[in-house]
């Protein structure tokens, strides 16, 4: 019997398993590897961390998110050193928004948390930023906060690999299968996988992302939200021209009728050997999946054509004259969380469910990749302290 089992081998689950395996020699981390080949033929679960680039930054309008990010980023060097796997790339990052004295604007709140936490940044008008970085254009009359230091992006695939490797080095058993059933009817929790295995654990952490509610059967207020991302392939010459590109988050002042805003990553080489600029945003009109099968169907598809067109338009507006080899759309899912009144909570859920020997850690709210180590640590600590 395991003392701890973590269900979900993603960013939060792998981080939690790394911490739990420091405290116990009876830990299992259960979750499938990334599907190979064409996603359209895959019948199992998916993970939005199957990617090469996620923005990492400390500046955030929420002090909680800023703290989780700051604490996670502080652990990146140790995780890279212990695993021998690099995943953190310092490119700097910008956030663009309204120039206003309103203390509750996104940028003003982000600037306050940066000052509280000692985050290094420079502040520009959009016109002044364009003079320094002429490749990138935002709307007139906006403010740009340019975070330096550790800001940039992480490779989420590599971060998961690093966390899993360290957990395994510390004695955790890695079970590369999908948990299909969680049975709490006994002195321990019984887990059954698609590979036919049955495992028992005293305490279980479910970190299954968008599938968490479907797997546990608990009503947790999780809202799996489909997103479309765009991958713009560029050649070596264009990548060289944009080699100083920071990550970009621009929501205030975009004024696009279809999407709320846009985030853009710098050129990154992907496993197919090509270099892409990845971007995403938030479509206003969303059809939410109501079941695990609908969620799987979304991942197997090609996303929203409306969202893809809007994203490509914004990319070419931010980087005028961008030369692309191809532009393709892919699917992603963000797991948000609402309270009993349907109001967006904006932070992850880390809480026990049922009889108390099962916990969940879910709802990354589209911002958890960079902060996943700290979120996983907090979940592991709470599970460890459960009695």
Set out the residue ranges of the language-model regions.
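Active-site substrate-recognition segment that forms the wall
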Residues: 18-23, 84-90, 198, 203, ...
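Internal hydrophobic alpha-helix adjacent to the cofactor/substrate pocket in enzyme cavities
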Residues: 373-387
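Flavin (FAD/FMN) cofactor-binding and adjacent substrate-gating region
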Residues: 78, 98-171, 175-176, 181-187
